[in-house]
Amino acid sequence: MRFSELVKSLDRARHYLRDFYLFGYRTREEYEAGRSYDNERRRIESWLGDSMRRTPAPGGRAVSLCLDAADEPRNPLYALWATKSFTRNDILLHFLLLDLLSGGGPLAADEAADALAERWGEVFGAATVRLKLKEYAELGLVEEVDSGRRRRYRLAPLCAEDLDEDLLEAVDFFTEAAPFGQLGARIQDELGRVNALFRFKHDFLVHTLDDAVLLTLLTATGEGRKVVLKLRGRTVSGTPVKALFGLQSGRRYGVLHRGERFTLIRLDRVDSARLGELDPDFEAKRQAFDALLPRLWGASLPYPLREERVRMVLTTEGRRERYVAERLKREGRGGSVTERPDGTIVYERRASDSMEMLPFLRTFTGRILSLRGDNRRMLRRFHDDLRRMEALYSLPGSGAALCSPMPKEGPAAKTTTARSGPMRDAASDDGTRCRAADALFHEAFGRYYVIAARLLERADREGPLTPEAIRRDVARWGFAETSTLLLPPLAEGEWPLFRRGTGRSFIPRLRSVRRPLSTLERRWLAALLEDERMGLFLEPEALRRAKDRLAGVAPLFQASDLCAFDRSRDPDPFRDEEYRSVFRTVLTSLREGRLLWARFTSGHGREVHGNFLPRRLQYSLKDDRFRLLARRADPGRPAWEETINLARIRCAVLGTRYAAAEAAARPPARTEPVVLLLTEERQAMERALLHFASFPCRPQTGPSGERLLHILYDAQDEKELLIRVLAFGPLVRVLGPERFVEMVRRRVREQARLLGHAAPQGGADAKGAV
């Protein structure tokens, strides 16, 4: 069968993409179906190009994906949603119907079929045209018009080009900062927009692979329905009441009410999801879970539910280390924080399962004076893990000796086909398909349709196109193998969108018509308009106009449907008018290429002012904060790089324009990568691979089969990375560089000194204060 980079279903591609991105250790021989592996690897290499890497591994070469989430203008994995396969009739009817319906009044299916034959000589049966119009009505691209007994159709009125520029800038931001960002990517592709203003931190790109499952759950929540989920060979049904996000762990969960209790289902383990019957008790179940939520620490729901106390006392250097108390208030998930005159800090929290708090508690390794709690098993594990860490890092140089060099990208080796075997189909016959989730993956929004639309638009604007111009544009806008697969049907007339002109030119047979926004895209925009961050981009009057334009459109999701349980409790003041004014001034300076004079308070409490050359606005999904990445531009002063928290800027004034070359973003100051040795204990390898996925990572298999992870990071993120490594305790081991190993060693040694290994005594299930 001829290779195609397009697919009918995402089931298999979703599986392989997750493997390549998170578990990039596996070689071809570790997959059951060698031929399927070859095809899917080739497709993903075509979609993602230079991000794919091959590294030597025992038994062959391992394929992995290395993406720097903090440096991507948008999620490269959104390409997955633009790969739906189609037929000649699909693409031809798409453009012919758009042209036909844009030129007059509404048409019935038989009238449209007659017009297609008369105007373009393309003969389609009335039934075929009727099915396509009905399909597009469900997508929201056309509207049904009541006309007596006959159904007539017209184009939906709102197109992407009708949106105001301020709203489109918001789309650039929310494409990464809100769920279902692939819908924003569609709008960007329709207009040829590129996000040049924003970058994102703590962004888990892999989440998009599970968006069809998430949308089915949220649709069921909005309609008060049950769902039927297929999980790795078993079927589960229940009533979804909320979606939980872990912005540090990287995991996403659906909360289902099953029987008499709530169950958390990891979205990445769901093969397929379908809508079930209405649940008359939905609202009562939602309220019951909302009442439980303050008692949870994360994604653990032990039964019977209990409440366990945890009390931790930390040592600091008083005001010099005020940031420790601030971090506890920001990340302590509602726990009480008491600062004492002697510089110690008391943190207290009640949780239904205090074992879940261990990773957070370990991030304060080197500062803990005492740790007490009701759960003796949790306390014993904390002390046991501390002993193990002390043994791991007891000798200077104990880590670096085992450190392997960073894996280098190997040449693209020719892959031969071996075994073959289809992957099990994830579809289930139970329940009803979610049409909204199906509309996420549809050929009308695919890359090939976008390319064809841009070629027609260019021909409208510039006249007949040469083969070289078409080839150049297809290579620019398509995937790696799109030119090979798309050019023949365009040039040879299989898709008669163009006809041969004089010489070698191509003349369009139809007009370029902008595709209307789909129902899903309009609903996504309606949800964004309810977000408090939208006030940063739109003045009140512009926000009112945007809401009027989308009047009657139900938001795709509600804020009450989603809960990021580990998001910072100290976000930027998005509703504050002074903050909004500063944000818009900074945004204008970036957009127009102008210097910025700013006065702000540094993290050490010092007042700073001066001229700055803005580079990017960086948004942290975990901290819910904006930071300005800029360079000092005062004459006679060093031009060092600055990272400024936007909430600390008290005054911002636009300056003069600067040359485009000056605005070019410098590469981040990268340090030698941290190398971790991963273990399988307590699922540590899987947890670590996802936890660190917001950094650019390169997996490697050592000569003895050990799993290594090379983490690349910016110098300014070193303390954060240290904290995140400490959260894993002895379950990961830092092998290098020696400077980073020494930082961990100092923390562990100091912690052992402070506690003196005062571990609790008693049985594994004993409880009591320690």
Predicted regions and their residues:
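Eukaryotic partner-binding/assembly regions in large regulatory complexes
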Residues: 1-61
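Bulky hydrophobic/aromatic content
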Residues: 13-21, 48, 94-96, 100, ...
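Polybasic (Lys/Arg-rich)
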Residues: 18-22, 26, 190-192, 276-278, ...
